[in-house]
Amino acid sequence: MIDSIQHRRSIRKFTDKLIDPDKLQIVLEAARLAPSGNNKQPWTFIVVQDEQRRRAVMEVCHEQSWMMSAPVFIVAVADMAERVEIKPGLCLDETSPQWELKRAIRDTAIAAGYILLEADAQGLGTCWVGFFIQSEIKPVLGIPEDKFVLGIIPVGYSAEQPAARPRKPLSEIVRFEKW
């Protein structure tokens, strides 16, 4: 597992080779098997392959044109329709009545991370895209208002292999027993 983690990079340039459907299925299966609080599995993943629809998604991602080189986008959506009332000014503090949404976001982020790692294990490149506005992305994909879009993951065969970026040392990010 650590090999995949060390090997994975954010890819922003893909070949025009289509993804083998079996590989895509395995990547999605990894997300399905991700852990979640109380096994709620509060996620939905939208697989976008149609070029016009991908273009519409790219446009609401502040026109990050590099995205169009990926043949597939996987959109990670936290699904809390039955557990949380979504309102403007939603407070995501654990003391708020909507704290379950925060849990759904955390759980969905774990599943999305599994997508990133399994895609790499399948020889595919990915990049996490979180630069968009909820009210713009939802209509493009018909996502109901009571859902929360975490991110878009362009997926494809990498046309580049970027060098490793500097990472903070463990001594800077890990504390034992307390802050």
Language-model features: where?
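Acidic, surface-exposed loops and disordered segments
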Residues: 1-179
